Amino acid sequence: MRPSGRAADALRSISLTRHYTRHAEGSVLCAFGDTKVLCTASVLAKVPPHKKGSGEGWVTAEYGMLPRATHTRSDREAARGKQTGRTQEIQRLIGRAMRSVFDLAALGEYTLHLDCDVLQADGGTRTAAITGAFVAAHDAVATMLRDGLIAASPIRDHVAAVSVGMVDGVPVLDLDYAEDSNCDTDMNVVMTGSGGFVEVQGTAEGAPFSRADLDAMTRLAEAGIARLVQYQREALGLA
């Protein structure tokens, strides 16, 4: 029995609340159970140096956690003067995930800057950030289309992410903190709406996992992400 009482293949309660803040071109509060991430998308009329004059745009991301997003308070990274390696890894992952479904030429020389701020953490913050950031990005693109900044949507597909793991020899979907801190294997999977893999991050926390375990976790992630994409479509009014 999972601590939450969920079945092994069950997601937590998922919600995607659009237009959560006033100023950003796209904003979403994404909740995976008790994990809550505010995702905003800002349209910037500039591109990084490596894209200048290319006619292409860029999609990038930043990630952070509020000091009391976790059980005990942690200092703001700004107060420490630098980002942790974990933060850098996660924000690069979010950026790669978003770019995997964007036609940068269709975006023109604009940057879509995604900010993902963890308000409350209970496992799976990076997967919630990716899933919510896509919806925020979609709304930002809709704003660009409305304002005549671009002629056609640069979004080619959906993208979402979920965690899977082995807990007491059983593959489980969408781990919360209690499971994540005690699992045998922890894996994060990012996929597109059409079923393409963007990233698979898997680590054995104790004993190595088998190929059969890997296949079982991957199948579980595929099914979970298909449901997350459906949640995205419903939130965006596309279902």
Swiss-Prot record:
GO molecular function term, any single one: tRNA binding
Name of encoding gene: rph
Role: Phosphorolytic 3'-5' exoribonuclease that plays an important role in tRNA 3'-end maturation. Removes nucleotide residues following the 3'-CCA terminus of tRNAs; can also add nucleotides to the ends of RNA molecules by using nucleoside diphosphates as substrates, but this may not be physiologically important. Probably plays a role in initiation of 16S rRNA degradation (leading to ribosome degradation) during starvation.
Keyword annotations: Nucleotidyltransferase, RNA-binding, rRNA processing, Transferase, tRNA processing, tRNA-binding
Residues that, per the record, bind phosphate: 86, 124-126
Family label: Belongs to the RNase PH family.
Database matches in NCBIfam families: RNasePH
PANTHER family cross-referenced by the UniProt entry: EXOSOME COMPLEX COMPONENT (PTHR11953), EXOSOME COMPLEX COMPONENT RRP41 (PTHR11953:SF0)
Biological process per Gene Ontology, one example term: tRNA processing
Lineage: Bacteria, Pseudomonadati, Pseudomonadota, Betaproteobacteria, Burkholderiales
ATP-binding found in the keyword field: no
Assembly description: Homohexameric ring arranged as a trimer of dimers.
EC main group: transferase
Catalytic reaction list: tRNA(n+1) + phosphate = tRNA(n) + a ribonucleoside 5'-diphosphate
Pfam families according to UniProt: RNase_PH, RNase_PH_C
Organism per entry: Cupriavidus taiwanensis (strain DSM 17343 / BCRC 17206 / CCUG 44338 / CIP 107171 / LMG 19424 / R1)
Official protein name in the record: Ribonuclease PH
Annotated SUPFAM superfamilies: Ribonuclease PH domain 2-like (SSF55666), Ribosomal protein S5 domain 2-like (SSF54211)
Enzyme Commission number(s): 2.7.7.56
CDD domains: RNase_PH_bact
